[in-house]
């Protein structure tokens, strides 16, 4: 994970590689990245493609915050991470957003988030503190084995 660190939010390939290494796709399914680098603070927006079930929302938002902390720690000039996600039809089909700034991430982990990306040891300490390692997903893909595992039913 530390090897995927990049100094620049404007390096789209490096940021996407880092996001994949962080596990954004494993956590939330298919996604796109939009980078706002025309002026500071630079932002990385994740646009999640699959809808989320309401009962998974709280846990998913916590994972978004954890993923954002890792991104903010490992992209030197990144100032915020934003998320855009949909709820399922039975949860009002709404599009919602979440943003975490570097300052908010620092408060979340209790120290300057940028220092958490200064060394593999500092990164590992943050990951352990965040209880980061997870293999659960929060998204719904209609008609897949994943639906059966989580007892989901998608109503579109």
Predicted regions and their residues:
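N-proximal, solvent-exposed amphipathic alpha-helical segments enriched in charged/polar residues
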Residues: 1-43, 51-53, 122-156
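Functionally constrained cores in energy, signaling, and assembly domains
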Residues: 11, 65-67, 84
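Hydrophobic beta-strand segments of well-ordered beta-sheets in folded domains
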Residues: 41-46, 79-82
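A short interface-forming secondary-structure element
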Residues: 48-61, 102
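Short, non-transmembrane amphipathic alpha-helical segments
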Residues: 56-77
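A short amphipathic beta-strand at an alpha->beta junction
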Residues: 72-95
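An exposed acidic His-Trp-rich patch
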Residues: 87-128
């Amino acid at each position: 994970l530390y090897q995927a660190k990049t100094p620049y939010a404007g390096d789209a390939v490096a940021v996407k590689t880092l996001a994949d290494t962080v596990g954004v796709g494993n956590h939330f399914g298919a996604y796109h990245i939009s980078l706002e680098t025309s002026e500071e603070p630079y932002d990385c927006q994740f646009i999640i493609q699959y809808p989320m079930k309401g009962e998974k929302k709280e846990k998913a938002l916590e994972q978004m915050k954890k993923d954002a902390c890792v991104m903010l720690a490992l992209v030197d000039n990144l100032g915020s991470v934003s998320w855009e996600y949909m709820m399922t039809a039975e949860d009002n089909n709404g599009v919602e957003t979440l943003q975490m700034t570097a300052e908010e991430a620092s408060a979340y982990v209790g120290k300057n988030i940028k220092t958490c990306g200064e060394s593999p040891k500092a990164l590992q300490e943050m990951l352990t503190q965040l209880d980061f390692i997870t293999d659960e997903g929060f998204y719904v893909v209609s008609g897949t084995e994943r639906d059966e595992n989580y007892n989901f039913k998608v109503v579109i």
